[in-house]
Amino acid sequence: ITALTAVPMGLETVNSQDIKVYNVSSEEYLAGSKIIDDLTPETSYRVSFYSGDEQSSDTYQARIEVKTTVTENLDEDYGTANRIDLRNEAFDPDYFNKLDWNSLAEGTTFVLPAGKTYVLNSGETVIEFAHSVHFVTPQTLEDYPTFSFDNAFRIVEGGVVDKVTFKRINLRASKSLSEVADNSLSGKQVICPESDVFLINTIDFTNCYIENFRSIVRSKKATGNVGAIAFKECTINAIGNQGIVSTDGKNGNYINDVSFDECTITNICGIADLRNSSSGKSISITNTTFCYAPMENSFLFRVDPSIAVKIENCVFGGSMKIDGKLPKFNELGSGGQDDYTGVYPFSSVNSFQANDRTSSKGNLGLSDSKMSTATLFTA
């Protein structure tokens, strides 16, 4: 490839001034990357690729369609008063373990450097949130930073936290997937308060890669409450037997609203364990793809019938294989359970399943894609 062109889509007539041409050097071609920085935000473009001295039908190779995003404005999104920009600081992997979290101002925003790994809650350290806090990586073409969890974030006793934000971060357990011995995986969570009384209004995950947790958010105590948990454009892989979000059995705590939008989710034991009637109001799953979910013989949902479950524009592959209690990642299992009770009245909209996906209990109401899991996810 020696050049590419970008043309705004939707034009009735394309003039020469509408066509942007970018030469591709041999170094850029070998790296597989060409940086373009003069396109209009929130605009769809048709990008065509050429090999040759001119851009013509003879040198045309391929094309794709892309949509640009709004340039991020940290000042507008998070304000300026309580921002800590770690891009300007000497890197310390234990930085967050050394902070006095009680002294942080409400709504403190940590701006993270690309490509760095921070170790969290290691040794005797336990980070407890007392205020709203935001962890944000600005738009970047570099690798996202990583949070490596030895243990979960917690909330101070009696704490009221309005919002916790994770944006463009790799969230991983410090224990590697190769060390997993059973379906609890790392045995850890991202957020798991131990306090008897707490309230978190919103937990927001945006464009994060999340891997190897027993659960991502778990509310354990009968008087602990989480208002809303949102996953947007996240990739979630390898979540254990507590499910992506969960409360502790039939205790009276609740996780009120859970949403997934434009996510890719693989190798999970289950989505939600919210079995108490006061556990919540709704679960919304839209524009999301699942494969190797749930774990073989495990449940995708364990929710009280009073909780509304919305599934729209989603695709589901087959279950994840298990050997005894050991998950076999990316291997197709014999089938799982859509619903632990078998009686939840699911009503999916424009959502499909692989023809080798089976449920021994419950029915999501998915349409048959007439394709196997292998065909769907390798096409």
Where are these regions (language model features)?
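Recognizes extended acidic, P/S/T-rich segments that occur
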Residues: T2-T40
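Extracellular beta-rich repeat passengers
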Residues: T125-I127, S132-A379
